[in-house]
Amino acid sequence: MTHSYTLRSVYAHHFLQAPNATMLIQEGQHISYLQFEQLVQKTEAWLLQQGVKRSDHVAVWLINRVEWLAIFFALARIGATLVAVNTKYRSHEVHYILANSHAQFLILQLNFRKIDFAQVVEGVEASSLPHLKTIMMVDADDNTPATLLNRPVVRFLPTLVQTSGAQINAPSVTDASALEDLPVIFFTTSGTTKGPKLVVHTQKTLSEHVRHIATGYQFGASGDALLTALPLCGVYGLDSALAAIAARMPVVLMDFFDVASASQLIKQHQITHIFGSDEMLRRFAEQNPEPIAFTSLKLFGFAAFSARFIELAQELIPRGFPMCGLYGSSEVHSLFSAQHRELPLEERVLGGGTPAAGSRASVRVRDPDTLELCAAGLSGEIEIKSPTLFKGYFNNPEATAQAFTKDGYFKTGDLGYLRSDGSFVYQSRMGDTMRLGGFLVDPTEIEDVLAAQPNIESAQVVGVEINGQPRAVAFAIAKNKQCPPDASATLKGVAKTLAAFKIPAHLWFVDEFPTTASANGQKFQRVKLREMALEKLR
């Protein structure tokens, strides 16, 4: 039997077999597979009317909502690419993504909570976006501007389109093959160069991976339900949601993570699966102090972004938090692997595990100094080969080439080791990239914004742990060393262009940065800077 790996194949068979089964739940509203299919058809038709065509890039800047997923599936049917934009981003980051993705269209909503999307967009330099043609506004009202960034604004109104909604018209074998290999989404990830890179996944790499998750994580038993508390614009939120859909498992969408609301939803819908961070676990535990917090949960897959997570697991697992360590990235997908649940607690909660794809994926570890492959138990750089790996970094062939070995393994930049049974353990990032707010952040991105502030000559940023949370802190050299600018005022200036989780918790002025000589010139000693920061925080 030949399998189709278009994005529509993720749920097409469920629509045919159980059209009235619940697919999504948001704010108490149940959306069936039939209702979702009708919305996707209308959205596809509307986007085509607006001029979206195959190979176009459409930036989507929305909170978690049914429309996000409908737009995604509709774009995939057209053969266009969704450019995922984090709702936490501000003008600096939004401009970077729009410019570097070559997005022709931008879909956003008017506002949400304290976020005024239109106002943020106004801070983007319109003249440096030659590809952008049209802006589409969800939830438009009488206050919606006629233009943004000197481009026309059209109201996003797919529900007004008339379609049959009767069936999924499967593409021909030839057309399906062409769609499978088209880029379906660009995720953003950090890197060693200025600004994030755009990670390209095709319909095949994405749809095949979420099927691996559904099977490998044993999704879809009677009564299973997923709470999507993470943003759909990131791999952890999107991959888990699509895997649940592939397994015909209801997905409860949260537009914004709030621990009180999330706790209520878990109990109300008898949620069995949730994915997040150790910080989310801490907040759940504080919100639900009873001896057994949740009785329905089967799996709380988590990534540890701070220290002392083993102590946390020892406390929470007996209280109804079935914690399991995971591994993933934008390049290899989230939920790439998970630890076996029968392992001792201390091993079960470590990052890494066994690939969801089973024998179709291969993991090895290489010594960064000798470049020899490591035996089990010896640490080195984790390398991964899988049919669902990303296809490259958009418009960045040099970075793409550097990311792979000659025999097709992705060089993750992560430190880890193999176990004797073939599973692996993730230990830490090998480079300077920081994990902030649940996202990988390149410090040079923050450094560039700091250096652009008045009276700042240059800046260096490192990550430290403050009150149990990973935070960025900064050192800067003032143009006038005798009279440096006010640190608080400088950080307020940074806040105008960077997402809140990227803003340094502290800024200290120094006369010079610690450096060390190398064959390629002077290099900044980030380890020394981190030590200096920890000393100041004592």
Model-based region annotation:
Residues 2, 20-51, 56-65, 69-73, ...:
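Conserved AMP-binding/adenylate-forming core of the ANL superfamily
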Residues 32-34, 177, 184-211:
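Conserved AMP-binding A3 loop
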Residues 354-360, 372-403, 441:
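Conserved ATP/PPi-binding loop(s) of AMP-dependent carboxylate-activating enzymes
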Residues 499-523:
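AMP-binding/adenylate-forming catalytic domain of the ANL superfamily
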Residues 49, 80-159, 295, 478-480:
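Structural core segment of the AMP-binding/adenylate-forming
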Residues 207-225, 233-273, 287:
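Conserved AMP-binding/adenylation subdomain of ANL enzymes
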Residues 89-96, 106-108, 274, 386, ...:
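AMP-binding/adenylate-forming catalytic core of the ANL superfamily
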Residues 272-276, 285-349, 362:
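Gly/Ser/Thr-rich phosphate-binding loop
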